[in-house]
């Protein structure tokens, strides 16, 4: 059963509109039907700089090696001027999740 993917039109993350358009295009193409959350300095505004990385948490089944490689390739080849770190929800500890939960912003799902 295919799941419809919803992209937040204006997430509360500190990136420019054209960067959001490019990122959301990559996410919807590579992670259809998956919930994706942003967290870290780009959601809290603390110590964020122009080239600060963007942390994304992926829900659902773990990405296959192929899926992860294609996503990484698309992000690396994008015009985004910052690194995007992908974190798989199934690999984090309950303590880490509890720490980041207050700053998580849904960007797709």
Q: What name fits each language-model region?
A:
Residues 1-35, 43-50, 59-109:
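Catalytic core of pol beta-like nucleotidyltransferases
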Residues 55-57:
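Short, well-ordered beta-strand segments
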């Amino acid at each position: 059963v295919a799941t419809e993917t919803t992209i937040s039109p204006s997430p509360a993350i500190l990136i420019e509109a054209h960067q959001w358009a490019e990122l959301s295009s990559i996410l919807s193409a590579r992670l259809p039907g998956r919930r994706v959350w942003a967290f870290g300095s780009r959601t809290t505004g603390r110590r964020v700089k122009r080239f600060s990385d963007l942390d994304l948490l992926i829900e659902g089944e773990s990405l296959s090696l192929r899926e992860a490689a294609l996503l990484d390739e698309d992000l690396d080849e994008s015009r985004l001027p910052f690194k995007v770190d992908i974190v798989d929800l199934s690999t984090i500890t309950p303590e880490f999740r509890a720490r980041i939960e207050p700053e998580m912003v849904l960007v797709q799902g």
